[in-house]
Design a protein with these regions (language model features):
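Ligand-binding clefts of soluble mixed alpha/beta catalytic domains
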Residues: 1-395
């Protein structure tokens, strides 16, 4: 339904935030018409500058709809709303005075109590490892290159101190606790280099059964301790094949999805490289409502990678052509594959997702630590989380 994430939903959230006690102030410094007129009026406080307009329909539409001729000021001007309708709380002469009024109003709010986990905030310490190294360590090609994830974490957390959980088990996911801007946090990150587990090599960026088990337990531990979780994505998905199925990848993957879905502590997600398919979901992707979802400029974000998607779509289209009697030759298939791949690659670009609000912000690597700390600052103002309930777990 086209309104699902548009104005109707915005109005709904306006009202819900008010019910939660979140202060909302608005300043009208221009024209607010139709749906845009409801937003400021649903706020706690409304400031309006002289010469601005606020109406459900402008003068031209009013004349067309009911034949009434009226000036903009008489219909919905600032003075009219201040003196006649009583809609405006504060009338100001210009933008500068309106902004100053907002500052004074904001200063009058009592400080909000912080969430329990935020009361344990300590003095922030810069990472011991140089943050400037991040640009050289992080992927520049959407996550296909291997790298040591611990080196990334060391350049984000306070003092580069990271207390790893089950470090020698399920090693394609790195879990542990640290401090970020003084706040206690849990971290779940995809390991991008090849690791050895029980004598066998495991591909970086892939979630194996044991890693899913470990991460599910760690997410529950963070909820038990009441601390936020930061997810660092660079994931191709869950491992497939005979060995993986016999290891219970579906059951154990479902356990991780369950734990993340029902987690009640704040979750922040960052797409460092690629984030694809069910791996994206398990790492607290957009559908799992993280408080913030950031991405680096080189990030890639889709159901699957470009090559795999193009091959799948090509197979479907080739089968359709064959059924219609038009058996394609190799050159035709190659041309079709390249056209599909190029189109899919454009959609993989993080700017494509950002333009559709699939991520909250595209962040430069050197700004990532600060963005995460600011996000935690915002999360700290939230109320205490409800009790954790996870339903039935596959064991």
């Amino acid at each position: 339904f086209p309104d699902q994430d548009d104005f109707g939903r915005v109005f709904y959230l306006n009202a819900r935030m008010s019910a939660l006690g979140i202060p909302q102030m608005a300043a009208i410094m221009g024209n607010c018409v139709a749906g845009g007129a409801y937003l400021p009026v649903m706020c706690d406080t409304l400031v309006m500058t002289e010469g601005s307009g606020l109406y459900l329909a402008g003068p031209a539409l009013v004349k067309a709809a009911i034949g009434q001729t009226v000036s903009s000021e008489d219909l919905g001007g600032a003075v009219m709303h201040a003196e006649v309708s009583g809609t405006v709380d504060y009338l100001e002469p210009d933008d500068a005075h309106a902004l100053e009024r907002l500052r004074r109003l904001a200063a009058g709010y009592a400080p909000r109590p912080v969430a329990g986990w935020a009361r344990d905030r300590r003095e922030s310490v810069e990472p011991a490892q140089k943050a400037e190294d991040l640009e050289g360590l992080l992927p520049v090609d959407g996550g296909s290159q291997p790298y040591e994830t611990h080196e990334i974490i060391a350049r984000l957390v306070d003092g580069s101190a990271f207390d790893e959980y089950k470090a020698r088990y399920g090693r394609t996911l790195v879990c542990g606790t640290a401090r970020l801007g003084g706040f206690p946090v849990g971290i779940v990150a995809n390991q991008k280099r090849v690791v050895k587990n029980r004598g066998r090599l495991e591909v970086g960026g892939v979630i194996y059964a044991e890693a899913a088990d470990k991460a599910a337990r760690f997410v529950l531990n963070c909820n038990q301790a009441g601390i936020p979780i930061v997810f660092l994505h660079d994931v191709n998905g869950f491992m497939v094949g005979v060995d993986s199925e016999q290891d219970g990848i579906i059951r154990r993957g479902a356990k991780l999805v369950n734990a993340v879905s029902n987690s009640v502590v704040p979750r922040l997600s960052v797409i460092l490289g690629g984030s694809y398919g069910a791996g994206h979901y398990a790492m607290s992707g957009k559908a799992y409502a993280p408080r913030f979802l950031f991405a680096l400029p080189s990030a890639r974000y889709a159901v699957m990678g470009g090559q795999q998607a193009a091959r799948t779509i090509l197979d479907i289209q080739a089968a359709q052509l064959a059924r219609s009697g038009a058996e394609p030759d190799e050159d035709t298939l190659a041309e079709l594959f390249e056209r599909i791949r190029a189109g899919y690659e454009r959609a993989l670009d993080i700017r494509y997702g950002a333009a559709r609000l699939w991520v909250d912000e595209v962040v430069m690597p050197l700004e990532l630590r600060l963005r995460l700390i600011r996000a935690l600052d915002a999360c700290a103002l939230d109320s205490e989380p409800p009790p954790l309930k996870v339903g039935v777990f596959q064991v």
